[in-house]
A protein has these predicted regions:
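Structural signature of alpha-helical solenoid repeat scaffolds
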Residues: 11, 40-43, 74, 102, ...
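Repeat-solenoid scaffold signature
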Residues: 150, 154-165
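Residue-level detector of extended alpha-helical repeat arrays and alpha-solenoid scaffolds
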Residues: 3, 19, 35, 66, ...
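Amphipathic alpha-helical scaffolding segments comprising HEAT/armadillo-like alpha-solenoid repeats
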Residues: 1-4, 15-28, 35-36, 47-59, ...
């Protein structure tokens, strides 16, 4: 589209002033496709100065715009974006938020570990991130979630063990293996 071509041409000389001018026009754009293009462009440009605008778009009722904002927030980074993305782990766009967090540039480990105290859906999504980042300091929480009443959380916790367990957890892993149900043995052996 012409809009995308114009944004691409502007990328050469884009700076915080241009980002601010474009973001200021965002509310006046008539359709969500145009807003989605602008939000995606801000994310692709890593427009840190417009993190607030991008994060606000996460709450859009338009699913495409919300998903574009989630992806853009992941590219922009920063604590505010991290908090907004972690909050989405229990929302309708949890899959998109998980993908953005998996590629998040920064230091999200503490936020991922803290998300293990969230709702069951947040816990299940955070367990995957904790394992992928190999956050061994979250091992105690992961072991505790093996006892969760929620089946999805329990399954995610067993899957996460391979990413968070360290040699100091050998005894606990052996105890789990002795007591494990057949379905859980494969996850423990990983």
């Amino acid at each position: 589209t012409y809009r995308c071509a114009a944004l691409d041409c502007a990328a050469e000389f884009a700076d915080d002033d241009l980002y601010a001018a474009i973001a200021k026009k965002l509310p006046s754009l008539k359709n969500n496709t145009a807003k989605t293009d602008v939000i995606s462009w801000l994310g692709a440009r890593h427009a840190v100065s417009q993190a607030g605008t991008v994060i606000a778009a996460i709450a859009s009722s338009d699913p495409e715009l919300a998903r574009a904002a989630i992806r853009a927030a992941g590219r922009i980074g920063g604590q505010e974006a991290l908090d907004a993305l972690v909050a989405q782990l229990d929302g309708p766009h949890a899959r998109e938020a998980s993908a953005a967090l998996a590629a998040f540039n920064g230091k999200p480990n503490a936020a991922f570990a803290a998300a293990l105290d969230g709702t069951p859906r947040t816990q299940a999504n955070a367990l995957k991130l904790v394992a992928m980042r190999r956050i061994t300091t979250a091992a105690d929480k992961v072991f505790a979630l093996l006892e969760s009443p929620d089946a999805a959380v329990r399954a995610a916790a067993y899957d996460a063990l391979a990413g968070v367990a360290s040699p100091k957890d050998f005894e606990r892993l052996c105890d789990l293996l002795d007591k494990a149900q057949e379905a859980d043995v494969k996850a423990l052996q990983a």
